[in-house]
From Swiss-Prot:
Catalytic-site annotation from UniProt: 68 (proton acceptor)
Protein name in the entry: Uracil-DNA glycosylase
Family label: Belongs to the uracil-DNA glycosylase (UDG) superfamily. UNG family.
The reaction(s) this protein catalyses: Hydrolyzes single-stranded DNA or mismatched double-stranded DNA and polynucleotides, releasing free uracil
Annotated EC: 3.2.2.27
Alphabetized HAMAP family for the sequence: UDG
Length: 227
């Protein structure tokens, strides 16, 4: 991640929202450059670390929270759960998300694992921790990303605009007290991981439920269709 001002790295609305943690973002950039200098790589690639914040802040209607990026080289792209279009086979969690997507909405299975269309339509795909060492899950937890992503979520709730948070798993559920401060409704279920998907993720219908809640709040629904 290059040493550049925050307003050159993210969308203008997000630059304002993240201003309280601008120094922390800069410190995380220093941390990542130190990792590279020490011969330790990180994922996703530098230009994608803040990718979730390159889509319009004011247009976010749904928040989907992940834990940290995929640790498999070639998978992480800076949007939670998403992968590059050429990744095959899909990560198991994403395959389970698509199984529920098809069952919930009746759409055919997507042709690839790229969730960019959701990000472009007002879905913030945000990991709590924005980087990871390759093949070392959770290796950057506690290194300093959590205050940044918490600030982002607090900024969303402070808008007092309709927001639906889709919280998959226990880690994501810890955000409920923050989300309760705004005009936000949370949908909770177990994580789509193979370890927990059969314990309540399948059949939870998060996509149609999110749209129903948005409509009840007077907001436009999300077009969840993927190519």
């Amino acid at each position: 991640m290059t040493a550049r001002p925050l307003n050159e790295l993210v969308e203008p609305g997000w630059a304002r929202a993240l201003q309280p943690v601008a120094e922390q973002v800069a410190r995380m950039g220093q941390f990542l450059r130190a990792e590279i200098a020490a011969g330790r790589r990180y994922l996703p690639a530098g230009p994608n670390v803040l990718r979730a914040f390159t889509y319009p802040f004011d247009e976010v209607k749904v928040l989907i929270v992940g834990q940290d990026p995929y640790p498999t080289p070639g998978h992480a792209v800076g949007l939670s759960f998403s992968v590059a279009p050429d990744v095959s086979p899909l990560p198991r969690s994403l395959a389970n998300i698509f199984q529920e997507y098809t069952a919930d909405l009746g759409h055919p299975p997507p042709s690839c694992g790229d969730l960019t269309p959701w990000a472009q339509r007002g879905v913030l795909l945000l990991n709590r921790v924005l980087t990871v060492r390759p093949s070392n899950p959770a290796s950057h937890r506690g290194k300093g990303w959590e205050p940044v992503t918490e600030c982002a979520i607090r900024a969303l709730t402070a808008r007092q605009q309709p927001l639906v948070a889709i919280l998959w798993g226990r880690d994501a559920s810890t955000l409920k007290p923050i989300l309760a401060q705004g005009n936000c409704v949370a949908i909770e279920s177990p994580h789509p991981s193979p370890l927990s998907a059969s314990r309540g993720f399948f059949g939870s219908r998060p996509f149609s439920r999110a749209n129903k809640l948005l409509a009840e709040m007077g907001a436009d629904e999300i077009d969840w269709r993927l190519p």
